[in-house]
Amino acid sequence: MRMELTKLSEKELLKLLTNKNEQESYKITNEVFEIIEKSDVFYPYFDGFLSLVEGRTSFMRMRGFAFCIALAKYDTENKIEKALPTLLSLLKDDKPTTIRVCLSSIKSLVEFKPNLKKEILPYLDTIDLGKYKESMSHLIAKDIAQLKNLLSR
């Protein structure tokens, strides 16, 4: 039986999303994304999702980032603009997968917030490719180049 996530308080939902059972958290994450795709019901939870960006695991950090970015299309209060430094701090994460997910998510952010392109560009130059294995640093460099191209348009 599928839980009705939209009836949960922010605190209850965040508890589920930060559950130590990663499989359960992943399932809930996918359901939240499905809901965000169709509705702004979780926009009031933006700050709670933003708090996940500083989470203990890379999964938590990526979730928080991706939820905030997904909510950009409903962002009537310019919360993304205010949270941008916190969100983009993940571009310095120790996990290369986190960097790649963030870079990919930024593409959808600028679709709804094109005014942020010039603010995002300088952050891309702060990514230290030297701290990742060559196989990953090559992929991250490619992601950065593609995103810079998109942001420069």
Model-identified regions with their sequence ranges:
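N-terminal "cap/leader" segments of large eukaryotic alpha-helical scaffolds
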Residues: M1-N30
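Flexible loop/turn segments at the boundaries of HEAT repeats in alpha-solenoid HEAT proteins
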Residues: R2-T6, E34-P44, A72-I80, L109-I120, ...
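Eukaryotic acidic, Ser/Thr-rich intrinsically disordered low-complexity regions
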Residues: R2-T6, L121-R153
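Buried hydrophobic core positions in alpha-solenoid tandem helical repeats
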Residues: E12-L14, G48-L50, I80, L84-L88, ...
